[in-house]
Amino acid sequence: MVTIRADEISNIIRERIEQYNREVTIVNTGTVLQVGDGIARIYGLDEVMAGELVEFEEGTIGIALNLESNNVGVVLMGDGLMIQEGSSVKATGKIAQIPVSEAYLGRVINALANPIDGRGKISASESRLIESPAPGIISRRSVYEPLQTGLIAIDSMIPIGRGQRELIIGDRQTGKTAVATDTILNQQGQNVICVYVAIGQKASSVAQVVTSLQERGAMEYTIVVAETADAPAALQYLAPYTGAALAEYFMYREQHTLIIYDDLSKQAQAYRQMSLLLRRPPGREAYPGDVFYLHSRLLERAAKLSSQLGEGSMTALPIVETQSGDVSAYIPTNVISITDGQIFLSADLFNAGIRPAINVGISVSRVGSAAQIKAMKQVAGKLKLELAQFAELEAFAQFSSDLDKATQNQLARGQRLRELLKQSQSAPLTVEEQVMTIYTGTNGYLDGLEIGQVRKFLVQLRTYLKTNKPQFQEIISSTKTLTPEAESVLKEGIQEQLERFLLQ
């Protein structure tokens, strides 16, 4: 028979008592009252913060947006099909944040910064809040460096600077996304990180943009944030802020970034859907009262940082879609008043074969020539003036048959200048090529050519100057000025190419 030793038993009990560790955690919980349409009403969650993340029993995450006296309105960041009435919800104590790192370059992610391109996880050691405060007045400096888009019409007459916010506005199918993607392609070798945010787009359109960027080697310096049309409204609403957080990460590390929001009309619609389902009072066009704040707090995050903060920059190109050219609708007027200028794309010009279909008359950049190199300023002033005069004359000439020679010449010059602004998609031009093209047009070298020959001649001229007069490009890129020497080289090249072209 086994003898029971009391001292052994007391030792074991003592050890167990010493090892016992009583941990008490306080969790803020609640109960689901109602769920549907991407919204859940929760009873409880007494100490939840506005914008705090909450976790449902089956793993779905939501954001507490409405804090009412007897319940909390939560928007779901998932379909929420498994959430049941009466199930428990716990507050996480966190505000929405995403991991950030260099490893995101070249990847396609969703609004929660999870990869959706099937190329595995992305490792990141740091994280940033999705909603961060914008830099203050002291943290900024005025915009002074150009951000070249590669499109002559924009870089010469509506210049964009690093740290500027320039709205791209127009009807559907007028080439808004094409202007934005061409700008991304033109940043190759410019040391600019690009972020393209697709909000509520068709998955096929996003795939097309990604393929186009991959084929031209632009994905190396680009991050694509995509929430397609079938995504929950909460994720479509968050996507632009996720893109801004990623761009900010690079901006505060003394780098230049470009962010494109395609498009903010769809984000406003997603936010309107969420607000109406949360029973917030509707305002103009049924948008909630704070839809201006929705966009202003996003676009104010674009900045040119001061020298103390490393002179990084974030340039924003928000896109807004208009309905049959109505620029005075609610969202377009809001975003126009927040941004530093707008590029207006016209369906009529697009259908008339003028592409990019930029209406130069009502497009404007409020930064202006501060964001241009000296060489471009030297040639662009004359171009702007001549095109404005041409637009007036053209309207007048429709009513008059017998025009004097000077007017006919001015009309002919204007038509050739308009031809010179046309560009194929995905064919951005360097600033040297643009200066040379504008100089050729404004100094009358194209006047002797048929309108149909202008683009062919300009393509040949660019090739000719690149191979036979490389010093022109060297002078412009080193001095940023159209020096008398560069001008004489250019004149010589144009004359030689004109003679060759007319002999063909």
Curated annotation (Swiss-Prot):
User: What GO CC annotations are associated with the protein?
Assistant: chloroplast thylakoid membrane; proton-transporting ATP synthase complex
Give the site residues for Required for activity. S363
Q: Mention one GO molecular function.
A: proton-transporting ATP synthase activity, rotational mechanism
Question: What keywords would UniProt list here?
Answer: ATP synthesis, ATP-binding, CF(1), Chloroplast, Hydrogen ion transport, Ion transport, Membrane, Nucleotide-binding, Phosphoprotein, Plastid, Thylakoid, Translocase, Transport
Membrane topology according to the record: Peripheral membrane protein
Q: Which reaction does it catalyse?
A: ATP + H2O + 4 H(+)(in) = ADP + phosphate + 5 H(+)(out)
**What CDD domains does this protein map onto?**
ATP-synt_F1_alpha_C (cd18113), ATP-synt_F1_alpha_N (cd18116), F1-ATPase_alpha_CD (cd01132)
Q: What is its main location?
A: plastid
> EC number(s) per UniProt?
7.1.2.2
Which residues are ATP-binding? G170, D171, R172, Q173, T174, G175, K176, T177
Kindly give the InterPro entries that the UniProt entry links to this protein.
Answer: ATP_synth_asu-like_sf, ATP_synth_asu_C, ATP_synth_asu_C_sf, ATP_synth_F1_a_nt-bd_dom, ATP_synth_F1_asu, ATPase_a/bsu_AS, ATPase_F1/V1/A1_a/bsu_N, ATPase_F1/V1/A1_a/bsu_N_sf
Q: What class of enzyme is it?
A: translocase
Q: Where in the cell is it found?
A: Plastid, Chloroplast thylakoid membrane
- Record PTM Phosphothreonine, positions in chain: T257
Q: Name one Pfam family in it.
A: ATP-synt_ab_C
- What NCBIfam families would the database entry show? atpA (TIGR00962), PRK13343.1 (NF009884)
How it assembles, according to the record, is: F-type ATPases have 2 components, CF(1) - the catalytic core - and CF(0) - the membrane proton channel. CF(1) has five subunits: alpha(3), beta(3), gamma(1), delta(1), epsilon(1). CF(0) has four main subunits: a, b, b' and c.
Q: What does this protein do?
A: Produces ATP from ADP in the presence of a proton gradient across the membrane. The alpha chain is a regulatory subunit.
**Entries under HAMAP family matching the protein:** ATP_synth_alpha_bact (MF_01346)
The family annotation for this protein states: Belongs to the ATPase alpha/beta chains family.
Protein known as: ATP synthase subunit alpha, chloroplastic
Supply the source organism for this entry: Nasturtium officinale
